[in-house]
Amino acid sequence: MLLFWCEPDYLLAMAVWSALLVVALRMLLLWRRRLKAASNEVVEARRERSGSKRSAQQTGSVVSGSVVSGSWKLKLAFSVWALVALLTSLELGFAAFVDTTDAFNATNVCHRWFRRHVDPYRNEAGFRDRRELKAGPQDDVRQIYFFGDSFTIAQGVDRLDDRFTDRVEAELNRRRGSTGKEIRVANLGEFGWDVSLIEGMVRATLEQGYRPDVLVYVYMLNDIEGYDPRTEIAIRSIQRSRSTFWLWTRTYFFNWMHFCWQQAQAGRTVDYFPHLADSYDSPVWQNVRAALQRIKERCDEHGVEFRMAFFPFLHNLGPEYPFEHAHQKLAEFCDEAGVKYLDLEPVLTPHGDEGLMVNRFDNHPNERCHALVAEAIVGQLLQDQIEKTVGEESLD
């Protein structure tokens, strides 16, 4: 149950709060019983035959006024309690049953998703992969490493087997059958990585003696943002708008709703995507191009074949896709550098109406999108790997 993945202090606070709601309800019910008893007294007073008629009327009038005053106050109190109970139910329901992500890993629901579906499955190198990396040449297998960001690590996809990297390995080995060497795919993706970080990780991986046969950089179009101050300013402005109020930071439902409100506000005030698109027509692109060239040269030095795949922004797919020029820049680099590549925009655009994103607030690819990407990678980017592994086995 998802509640067991919540923080202990949250569970304690909600237990205390729920107990207070129960106590408040009991007090309201006691109040209602007392008002009912007072109302009965009014009836009895009006029926009272002893004493003067004027005295009975005065007594009934006083008690009746008190009952009427208490009655509307009780109704108001019950209404407030019902509203608070409803909001508490929404909070507990959200905490107990909602297991998803947001685009920026900014909500408590998303943080918990990472604790459930990512952190327990990290290998010794820190990557979300069921298999450990082995340094040195691996003569008995053919290795393919995928580097990338959260699109590669598969944010929002619960099962490892549903990621495109795991699907690629399964399909390549299925097509290989009993011939050739086993093909092993390693996922070296991480949330928030850009070109500069991936360049450093590629360098460190190769210098530490890891020798994949093919290294694929799954490039996401926001990988350029670390080189452009404008996009960094836009991101910081979003981060600065985050509240420190406990109701927005220590809950699940209210935290999510606050995030949605922030996203709506940011969409009207922050020009993140326009700046990002402009980056590819500015000198910033030359810095990214140089970094890609260095990755290619580093791979060549260690006898590793470098390839690329370009991921589009899924929420922008369509006839007026604003990042078409960015894909062209990347393709031109690959053609000039002799890098085999796969542009996923033409692959995914025909399926844009099938719902390729994790959810409305997270534009990372979902399981359906990962399946399409895996099929394209096997059929267009890595279609030669089966022949190569069969050829290598015959040479051995």
Predicted regions located by residue number:
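Histidine-centered active-site loop/cap adjacent to the catalytic His
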Residues: 340, 360-396
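Short, amphipathic alpha-helical "lid/cap" segments that border enzyme active or binding sites
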Residues: 195, 199, 285, 289, ...
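Membrane/wall-proximal cationic-aromatic binding patches
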Residues: 94-178, 348-352, 360
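Membrane-embedded alpha-helical segments of integral membrane proteins
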Residues: 1-33
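Hydrophobic membrane-insertion alpha-helices, especially the h-region
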Residues: 78-92
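Conserved SGNH/GDSL esterase-like catalytic core that processes O-acyl groups on lipids
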Residues: 145, 154-240
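Membrane-interfacial, low-structure loops and terminal tails that flank and connect transmembrane helices
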Residues: 33-72
